[in-house]
Design a protein with these regions (language model features):
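Low-complexity, highly charged intrinsically disordered N-terminal segments
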Residues: 2-90
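Conserved phosphate/anionic-ligand binding catalytic regions in large, soluble enzymes, centered on
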Residues: 102-108
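Polar low-complexity intrinsically disordered regions
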Residues: 1-2, 165
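Domain-scale recognition of functional cores that engage charged ligands
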Residues: 74-97, 108-231
């Protein structure tokens, strides 16, 4: 297989039909592929990024029309559930891990750290409260952090030594190149190259669980369920 970097400078007119379409795609995505590969990002993540990049440049928005959304009209009352369901739930706790999506910064609230570190009550942050809840239920707590939230969030969890005796406290989501809106090319910021990258969003959890080894680690230790929510 020819690496896409070798295709730069090749005249697409030598190809026809589907070949030319493929060639155009390879040329337009090559700057992203090369940048991500140089950063050591795994192939499965690069392929996922390119999949959605191709949708972007083809005009797809990813939006769901409001007319296609139907509101929930009735929610079951947990107090009405039969007792055997509660017993099943209690037994399942020993096979359940809590994963909190913790990649976002609180810049809009004046915080240059993870939003979960914002103090909310009596000096406790959201993450403090989450850690207390995890300790009370005796379930492992894992954070999906971004490269911007990892260090500060783990420093806070050091206050809770009883968390996760046999599992890591976090795994990292990937990073992806920012895209210019005017020409769909990677953003260039030589003065601060870190500003050329951004987190890919919550949907990266599926890829990050695999590439970080977290999914394999959870399965090896007998966990079957994950409760996933924002931090």
């Amino acid at each position: 297989m020819i690496h896409v970097s070798t295709l730069m400078g090749v005249d697409p007119r030598i190809f026809t039909g589907n070949e030319q379409k493929l060639m155009n795609v390879l040329i337009s995505t090559a700057p992203f592929v090369n940048r991500m590969a140089a950063a050591g990002l795994p192939t499965i993540f690069i392929e996922t990024f390119i999949h959605y990049y191709e949708q972007l440049v083809s005009g797809q928005t990813g939006y769901i029309a409001e007319d296609d959304i139907r509101p929930v009209t009735q929610i079951p009352d947990v107090e009405t559930f039969p007792q055997h369901l509660a017993e099943i739930g209690q037994r399942s706790l020993s096979k359940t891990a809590v994963i909190k999506l913790n990649g976002g910064l609180g810049t809009s609230m004046g915080l240059e750290q993870a939003k979960s570190l914002l103090p909310v009550k009596e000096g406790y942050s959201f993450l403090d409260i989450i850690a207390h809840q995890a300790q009370l239920t005796n379930v492992p707590l894992l954070l999906m952090n971004s490269f911007s939230t990892e260090e500060d969030s783990l420093a806070l969890l050091d206050r809770y030594p009883n968390l996760n005796k046999d599992l890591p406290h976090s795994f990292l989501q990937h990073k992806e190149p920012k895209i210019r809106q005017d020409n769909w090319q990677p953003v260039e910021w030589p003065e601060n190259p870190e500003l050329e990258w951004c987190p890919p969003g919550h949907g990266d959890i599926y890829t990050a669980l695999v590439t970080s080894g977290t999914l394999e680690g959870l399965l090896q230790k007998g966990y079957e369920y994950a409760f996933v929510s924002n931090a």
